Regions:
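Long, distal/terminal scaffolding or interaction modules
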Residues: 1-198
Length: 198
């Protein structure tokens, strides 16, 4: 297990390799378990249970095994490739952006607590692009560079994974901000509004 709390973790294969990082596991199972903050950039695939119980870290990886983002409560995860089964089981917070080139991700995501949406909102697009850019800058990822170089073609293939409760809260916060409340006050009022309606 490799939890992080702050800082920046960069994992990349050594120079001169003859395999494609995006097709090979480079970090094992339960990496970033219980991570609370910081950033991780992995040029390659993670094993099973990647970012389980992540509560605030940001991670970019090029594929994950089974049970990725399980019980995640916060943070952001970008997956630039395939996932295993049962992705996002019990996920109640945070956001994941998953590249779904074969249009079959819906078969591997656990839809009990999350929805799948296209990445269309300007904030999501900017966040996704910036994280991929940072990933390429730090790891030299060929896969990341390929996606960045043709971003407008790849963007429609990404899915945003968002927990239902979290999505509802974000919408209530946005409506409070539209009424003129600033960020923190909007969050407080949204919390009370949601609690009142339970």
């Amino acid at each position: 297990a490799l939890p992080i709390s702050g800082g920046k973790l960069v994992v990349r294969p050594p120079e001169g390799i003859t395999f494609k990082p995006e097709e090979n596991i480079i970090i094992g199972n339960v990496a970033l378990y219980g991570a609370t903050s910081g950033k991780a950039f992995v040029s390659g695939v993670a094993g099973e249970r990647f970012c389980v119980r992540n509560s605030g870290a940001v991670a970019v990886v090029e594929g994950v095994g089974d049970h990725g983002c399980e019980y995640m409560t916060g943070g952001t995860v970008v997956v630039l490739g395939q996932t295993g089964k049962n992705f996002a089981a019990g996920m109640t917070g945070g956001i994941a952006y998953v590249l779904d080139e074969n249009w079959d991700f819906y078969q591997r995501v656990n839809k009990e607590t999350v929805s799948l949406e296209p990445v269309e909102h300007k904030y999501d697009v900017a966040t996704l692009k910036e994280l991929i850019r940072e990933h390429v800058e730090l790891t030299g990822s060929p896969r990341g560079k390929e996606i960045l170089d043709d971003f407008s073609e790849f963007l429609p293939k990404f899915k945003k994974v968002l927990p239902y409760d979290y999505d509802h809260m974000l919408r209530v916060i946005a409506s409070m901000e539209e009424r003129g409340l600033d960020g923190e006050q909007a969050q407080i009022e949204a919390f009370y509004a949601v609690q009142k309606n339970k």
